[in-house]
Design a protein with these regions (language model features):
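Alpha/beta-hydrolase superfamily serine-hydrolase fold, recognizing
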Residues: 15, 53-63, 69-302
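A glycine/proline-hinged amphipathic helix-loop "lid/cap" segment
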Residues: 1-69, 301-302
Length: 302
């Protein structure tokens, strides 16, 4: 049972403002911010009804999450963290929720991060991981690609790369609070700057600059909002109405639909970045996770 929403929602927002958003505005080194995110991961506990192990998937390590009830489907999740932070540790609880609800094996990939590794290191790791799943015997129609925040840029880049290579495409894409325009030039970045309780443009710009290497921020290889978006698998996009990244999600959905793609863009009123992580406190997060499970079930071909 969830606590009263009139109490928990403002408390969570206040907590995020005084911790995550405050830190995101500082000039602290990226390594310090990365470490603080790892420490904060202790507040989110994985479900007990899943089995966790660390494995090698392609060239990178990954957290493998297997629920008690697992059908023949698999999720490859690329975590967020503005390209320089986040890991299978920070996203362990989310991984357990997605695996259990989708009745799917889930791999949370520890791809190489900026600033130590700029583009295309993360994409290369994701490509290798996807082909490793195929090598294990998974069929493309059994595979879903998922991501949150900056991880969504990697997911879209992976999907478009597979399409352009003529490789088999996965059954669907799941994008949570996508950060896919590294120029940070869309209106919501300004309009929601005060309303967003979690993110600042400052930290996203620092992460984007660390990741892009010598590429321009609007290069479609790193800002997939500007990439050719035709012939993609079905997509589910979820975003909070108070995010500075709201327009990333909305414009991405519009551009894919304009190319004839199937996309369901769900805007959750009053919600913030990656609100799905707070499912034990917020009913909207619980609903969002169930929507993800429904999308996976609908698009499964097993």
């Amino acid at each position: 049972m969830h606590p009263p929403q009139r109490l928990t929602r403002p408390l969570v927002k206040a907590s995020l403002r005084s911790t995550f958003k405050l830190a995101s505005r500082t000039p602290l080194p990226l390594g310090v911010l990365r470490a603080s995110m790892e420490l904060g991961a202790g507040l989110f506990v994985a479900r007990r009804d899943v089995r966790l192990s660390t494995v090698k998937l392609g060239a990178a390590a990954a957290l493998c999450v297997v629920p008690k009830r697992s059908n023949k489907r698999v999720l490859l999740h690329l975590h967020g963290g503005a390209f320089f932070a986040g890991s299978s540790n920070t996203h362990r609880a989310m991984a357990s929720e997605l695996a259990a609800r989708c009745h799917a094996t889930l791999y949370m990939l520890d791809y190489r991060r900026a600033p130590e590794h700029a583009y295309p290191a993360a994409l290369d790791d994701a490509l290798n991981a996807y082909h490793a799943l195929l090598g294990q015997g998974w069929m493309p129609e059994q595979i879903f690609l998922a991501g949150d925040s900056g991880g969504c840029a990697h997911v879209l880049s992976l999907a478009t790369a597979l399409r352009d290579q003529g490789s088999p495409l996965p059954a669907g894409l799941i994008l949570l609070s996508p950060f896919v325009d590294l120029t940070l030039s869309l209106p919501s970045v300004t309009h929601n700057a005060k309303r967003d309780p979690m993110l600042s443009a400052n930290i996203l710009k620092r992460g984007a600059d660390a990741y892009r290497g010598k590429l321009a921020l609007n290069d479609p290889r790193i800002s997939p909002l500007f990439a050719p978006l035709h012939d993609l698998p079905p997509l589910l996009i979820q975003v909070g109405s108070e995010e500075i990244l709201l327009d990333d999600a909305v414009q991405l959905a519009e551009r894919i639909q304009a190319k004839g793609g199937a996309v369901d863009c769900q805007v959750y009123q009053g919600m913030w970045h990656n609100f799905q992580m707070f499912n034990r406190l917020i009913t909207e997060a619980e609903d969002a996770l169930e929507q993800i499970a429904g999308f996976v079930l609908k698009n499964s071909h097993t």
